[in-house]
Amino acid sequence: MATVSVCMIVKDEESVIKRCLSCVHAFADEIIVADTGSRDQTVSICEEMGAKVFSFPWRDDFAAARNFAFDKAGKAYCMWLDADDVMSLAGREEFQNMKRELTDSADMVLLPYHTGFDEMGRPSITYYRERIMRNAAGFRFQGRVHEAVALSGSVVKGTAVIEHRKERKGDSFRNLRIYQDMERRNEEFLPRDLYYYGRELYFHERYEEAEKVFQRFLQAFLRDREGWKENKIDAARQLAVCCYGLGQEEEALLALLQSFVYDMPRGEICCDLGRHFLDRGRYREAVFWYEQAL
């Protein structure tokens, strides 16, 4: 059976950390916690529950903190979790079964991640994340914000579901501040960084700046063919909203149509196009695009 080090970065998570660690005790062979400056009881709770806790001075870099935690791991595989992640009993059982079948031939395991839930508690947003990496393969996180590991080697999909159950709101300006600091320092922006930087500007209704960043992201894709296609489609859609906010209606329409370069038309984009023509009294064109969404 494969051995797994569960690796986490935490700060002031006393309200949720015990819930998370109670889940992972079922399958973790080692728990590594990188604490970035907790002032509550997080560290003592982690230690009481058998985790190895290491101090990591925070420097606005999530990838660096994740990599620090991975560097402390001693088992065959490293698995990352957030403090407000949980697993159901069924998910834990599926994970145990996966451990029995996991061999050294697998470099990376993708697991489903539920990050949004409807009013009935049912998952409304689910996608796969790179969750488990072979320790000796030297995988590294990239990105000061929205850190991720590039897929490589032998990649397999598992079925054990991780649920992200956030209980408190974080600092809504934190990510934006980090990206702006990267700009001031002239740090390199990877395509993924540009996408999420544009989103942060968009969410804060800084449309003119967001438009420029989304354009940089989409131009980088056309030049280098890098980036996840769903991010490109979403960037084109949010670019359109920025253009509307700036009174650039034709540019907004072109942004929506640009999404078709990346993949088959998405229903959401077709609805956006329908709304564009409906708002301008061009009903036949609106009907056409709404029908495409069906």
Where are these regions (language model features)?
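N-proximal low-complexity "stem/linker" segments adjacent to membrane-targeting elements
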Residues: 1-23
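Tetratricopeptide repeat
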Residues: 25, 173-176, 180, 211, ...
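Start-of-helix register in tetratricopeptide repeats
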Residues: 192, 227-234, 268
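Conserved donor nucleotide-binding strand/loop of the catalytic core
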Residues: 43-68, 72
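A conserved acidic beta->alpha catalytic loop
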Residues: 23, 35-47, 58, 82
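Catalytic-site signature of metal-activated, phosphate-bearing donor transferases
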Residues: 64-70, 76, 87-212, 216, ...
